[in-house]
């Protein structure tokens, strides 16, 4: 190698050293910024009256990643009475793409409400989040997956499922709108709820599956202010597909409804029910429908199903109005309140 070649090699080596030093400085500053930012966020929550404590905040992963861990983490919001305790909470991002974050939860967590404490077990619970660049951390998309999941309450109930996946994505052409997809399998609701819905014990204790595709429109973006200040509230929901299977009962739904400031929905849904007579029997047995009303509904719906040529399958238009769910002029029961706390 000649002198020119040696000089070129020394120059390239110097550039590599300078680049490595610059990258090391960037990583160290960014890691320190993450630690200070999290500590500042916890201080701000405490100033607002929260209980917000992280035993230790650490950032590792040099040079390619920022792997952040808070251990343990305890949060409690006095405005809602909700509290969340974890032995650790972790998230990570590539150094060159910090707005895309992978989140990890421990297998054991605890949630407390004003009335009960719930022990949570979650197998392989992970998420992937994408944020718009900026301090607001506005959510662009999210994916959450979990394996076996269980809830045990000190109020005496327990529930579980075999697994679930949730996806959301902001719609660029519709401010505040999020496309939602959810699928869950092997759901075991609390025994008391199953006994209320099915007092005769005709159905299995496990819901085989639920799948939902919908668009939800909120009055504010999902960003850090959704945790610090107020939850974005639903203003409109479009259900493209809802499929649920419980034993021999199958339910499909689609429709659209608005949500007012009090969380009351108004709009319409179309339900397709397979083995719908068993559903009426469940509503009658649980007390949701009185015997005379159940008889009238079964007679009227039987006529509709017969006209369709499929007596075991029924398409039913429902209205949501005045805080009730209606089948024509008949109120079936209260509509759910959709206000987010």
Protein language model regions, located:
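Extended terminal
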Residues: 9-13, 55-58, 227-232, 236, ...
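N-terminal type II signal-anchor transmembrane helix
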Residues: 5-39
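Extended lipid/amphipathic-ligand handling interfaces
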Residues: 57-59, 86-96, 120-136, 153, ...
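Flexible, membrane-facing loop/turn or short amphipathic-helix motifs
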Residues: 74-83, 109-120, 148-159, 170, ...
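Beta-strand-enriched cores of mature, soluble protein domains
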Residues: 165, 180-184
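Short extracytoplasmic/periplasmic juxtamembrane "stem" segments immediately C-terminal to an N-terminal membrane anchor
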Residues: 38-56
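N-terminal beta-strand/beta-hairpin edge segment
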Residues: 50-173, 242
